[in-house]
């Protein structure tokens, strides 16, 4: 939508994790950020742009792969491939918090920094994991995506900006376009 309206605008994107965006957003060095829900300082404003289910990933030859869905309890009993807590992704807090709310602490077999690495390691048979449904676009024959039984297994993505630093006209238009997209698609 934004690209169609403003084809000559070059958007400089920086791929960083949630934690790495908070200070630059607060200081006005970043105009906008897309973050998974996390604790934000009072200097930042946000609006939810996406709410999506979390899905389980299991190796294709795993017994759970034959099930139509899976519980958090069943996943927590398996070796877990998960985010490194030092990387600072909002998904780490989302997923671990969900498991803990249901009284589960996963046995973490492998910690990595990127979701794509998690997908590859699950496909290689090193464990199970959980990621948002938007990652389901990655289809590998060695793994299977499964719905999670618990209805509150969801993740949100937020558009975040500074409350105290004025945004340029194009950043404001981009924000308006993204929020209009959200209204159309939610």
Model-derived features with residue positions:
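Flexible hinge/capping segments at coil-to-helix
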Residues: 44-80, 171
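Secondary-structure junction motif
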Residues: 80-102, 167-175, 182-185
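Conserved functional loop/turn residues at catalytic and ligand-binding sites
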Residues: 10, 24, 28-29, 48, ...
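Central regulatory/effector-binding core of bacterial HTH transcription factors
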Residues: 1-42, 111-112
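Short helices/loops that flank or line small-molecule/ion binding pockets
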Residues: 14, 19-29, 96, 100-102, ...
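Beta-alpha-beta core module
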Residues: 42-48, 52-53, 57, 116-163
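Residues at or immediately flanking beta-strands
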Residues: 8-12, 105-109, 156-158
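Short loop/turn segments at beta->alpha junctions
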Residues: 17, 71, 113-114, 132
């Amino acid at each position: 939508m934004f690209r169609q309206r403003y084809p000559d605008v070059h958007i400089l994107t920086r791929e960083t994790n949630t934690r790495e965006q908070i200070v630059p957003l607060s200081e006005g060095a970043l105009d906008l950020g897309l973050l998974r829900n996390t604790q934000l300082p009072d200097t930042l404003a946000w609006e939810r742009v996406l709410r999506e289910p979390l899905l389980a990933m299991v190796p294709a030859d795993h017994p759970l792969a034959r099930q139509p869905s899976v519980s958090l309890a069943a996943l927590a009993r398996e070796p877990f491939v998960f985010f490194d807590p030092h990387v600072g992704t909002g998904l780490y807090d989302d997923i671990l918090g969900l498991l803990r709310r249901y009284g589960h602490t996963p046995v973490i077999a492998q910690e990595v920094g990127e979701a794509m690495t998690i997908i590859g390691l699950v496909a290689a048979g090193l464990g199970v994991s959980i990621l948002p449904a938007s990652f389901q676009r990655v289809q590998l024959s060695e793994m299977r995506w499964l719905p999670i039984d618990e209805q509150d297994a969801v993740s949100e993505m937020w558009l975040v900006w500074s409350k105290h630093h004025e945004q340029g006209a194009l950043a404001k238009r981009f924000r308006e376009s993204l929020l209009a997209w959200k209204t159309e698609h939610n």
